[in-house]
């Protein structure tokens, strides 16, 4: 759900006073909302710089956009752009410079920022983006001399409660009466069992599927897939509210075990969730996008021109920093990000 990128420094003309500006941050780290970001700015000068402004910024933004047809019920129609945006965080630290000048050579500036406790996860799709970055810059008396930007991976937190009954449907069943060979009929029953259906990014999703084939045909294809359903919220140029639903397949497996005629087969499957995921959210959160997940098992019945599906809602949640540290401490493992300075 979003890759870390690094933008090149601003190109410098020959004999520029600034040779380079670099950002030093941990490689490929995923930051939990509410945690601390520590890093360094390394500024290298070709010559003395007077009255410099050296600063670093933490920025988080979201943006959604799509086009849709308007006036379809009238004699004419046209496409309108629907969009929306959100600002999640913008913090700036300006470094003190002794005597208001820096000599030629390298200068290192340490910084840290605290992420807000409630943030959406880094995300990108064809309709929306949520992104975070740290940007360092050096300004002279009149203009920016150099800047460098690095994008961050941020895992959002969730307020979904694990104990609500809706979030724990441990057993789902679907049944289909099918006709084949003109006059023959039979029944295919599909059951999914899970110990729980609430998970955090990086966890394993384990579930058991039972297929009861009461037909004289062999079932050869059973597909397991995890889908993300994302609803985007936006506005037209005339400020009319619009929404758009988009679905994507995150994970997919196919069972290699055929289900013979008049027989029952059990399949135990495991999905390894990505380390970075948008958390499940409701449409009442007031955000620019909302995410829900669904585990779908599909039995294809080509000889009857149909298929049978069973669906289980999956809840993706992520604890706050304080909760995560308490849990890790109980397990005897040191937290990844233990400092919470203001």
Curated annotation (Swiss-Prot):
Domain of life of the native organism: Eukaryota
Cellular location(s): Membrane
Matches recorded under Gene3D superfamilies: 2.60.40.640
InterPro entries, per the entry: Arrestin-like_C, Arrestin-like_N, Arrestin_C-like, Arrestin_domain-protein, Ig_E-set
Keywords associated with the record: Differentiation, Membrane, Spermatogenesis
A biological process term (GO) from this entry: cell differentiation
One Gene Ontology cellular component annotation held by this UniProt entry: endosome
Pfam families: Arrestin_C, Arrestin_N
Reported tissue expression: Testis-enriched.
Role, per record: Plays an essential role in spermatogenesis. May be involved in the anchoring of the sperm head to the tail during spermatogenesis by affecting SEC22A-mediated SUN5 and NDC1 transport and localization.
Family membership: Belongs to the arrestin family.
Protein name as catalogued: Arrestin domain-containing protein 5
Higher taxonomy: Eukaryota, Metazoa, Chordata, Craniata, Vertebrata
């Amino acid at each position: 759900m979003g890759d870390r990128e690094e933008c090149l420094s601003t190109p410098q003309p020959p004999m520029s006073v600034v040779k380079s500006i670099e950002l030093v941050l941990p490689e490929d780290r995923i930051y939990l909302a509410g945690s601390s970001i520590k890093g360094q700015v390394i500024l290298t000068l070709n010559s003395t710089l007077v009255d410099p402004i050296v600063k670093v910024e933490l920025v988080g933004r979201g943006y959604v956009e799509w086009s849709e047809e308007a006036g379809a019920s009238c004699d004419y129609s046209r496409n309108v752009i629907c969009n929306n945006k959100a600002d999640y965080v913008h913090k700036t630290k300006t470094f003190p410079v002794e005597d208001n000048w820096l000599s030629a050579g390298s200068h290192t500036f340490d910084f840290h920022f605290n992420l807000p406790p409630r943030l959406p996860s880094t995300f990108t799709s064809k309709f929306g983006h949520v992104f975070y970055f740290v940007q360092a810059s050096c300004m002279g008396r009149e203009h920016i001399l150099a800047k460098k930007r690095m994008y961050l991976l941020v895992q959002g937190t969730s307020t979904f409660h694990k104990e609500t009954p809706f979030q724990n449907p441990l057993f789902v069943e679907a049944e289909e009466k099918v006709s084949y060979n003109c006059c023959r009929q039979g029944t295919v029953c599909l059951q999914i069992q899970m110990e729980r259906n609430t998970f955090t990014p990086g966890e394993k999703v384990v579930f058991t599927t039972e297929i009861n084939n009461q037909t004289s045909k062999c079932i050869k294809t059973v597909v397991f897939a995890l889908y993300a359903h994302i609803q985007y919220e936006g506005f037209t140029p005339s400020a009319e509210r619009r929404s758009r639903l988009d679905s994507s397949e995150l994970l997919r497996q196919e069972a290699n075990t055929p289900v013979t005629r008049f027989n029952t087969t059990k399949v135990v499957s495991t999905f390894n969730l990505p380390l970075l995921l948008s958390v499940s959210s409701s449409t009442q959160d007031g955000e620019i996008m909302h995410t829900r997940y669904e585990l779908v098992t599909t039995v294809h019945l080509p000889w009857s021109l149909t298929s049978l599906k069973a669906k289980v809602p999956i809840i993706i949640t992520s604890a706050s920093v304080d909760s995560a540290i308490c849990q890790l401490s109980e397990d005897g493992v040191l937290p990844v990000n233990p400092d919470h300075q203001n």
